[in-house]
Amino acid sequence: MPSLFRRLGMTSHCSPLRRRLTASGLEDAESLMRLAVQRGCRYYRDTVTGTVVDPGTDRVPNEELAIGLLHGSWEWSPAALRMGAAMLGARDNDPSKLLRLARMERAETLVRELAKIGWSIEPAHPLWSYLLHELPDRGPIPGGVLPHPTRFMAMTGITREGRGIRSQWIRPEVVRG
């Protein structure tokens, strides 16, 4: 299976983030996906099996986990992209840190495209507006690289207010103790 960089028509690079993740015991996309599930991406818990030792958010913050899952050097994986998108929208993420990491890791085009999808679902959420404003538009991502936009959202059919589709970005639940 080709890497995400290859599917995007980009060359790979020596990644400081990937070196940090590996040094923290997270050596592949599968271990990052396990960590994402442990950190609250329970929506995807049936996607991966097993656990990984969580190095802690002081060593691997959720912003780094998000960009790590979206990293172009891993083998292309729709599940990793979906979990990376969920972690991108985590409630306590620092938008400026996400921006810096996206630039450093050559993920600007991908993060901008996810922000565009996020904004279409949650136009009032400040993260999506910030990323869209700050990241350059380098054109569309080739078809078939990203999962369909509906794979990044949860939709309801019937709510307390009655019938109607309500969409929201899938993001990690807050994990307590």
What are these regions (language model features)?
Residues 1-23:
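Basic, Lys/Arg-rich alpha-helical nucleic-acid-recognition elements, primarily the DNA-binding modules
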Residues 2, 40-41, 127, 149:
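Generic intrinsically disordered, low-complexity segments enriched for polar/acidic and small residues
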Residues 14, 36-37, 145, 162:
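Short linear sequence motifs
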Residues 122-177:
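Charge-dense, extended regions
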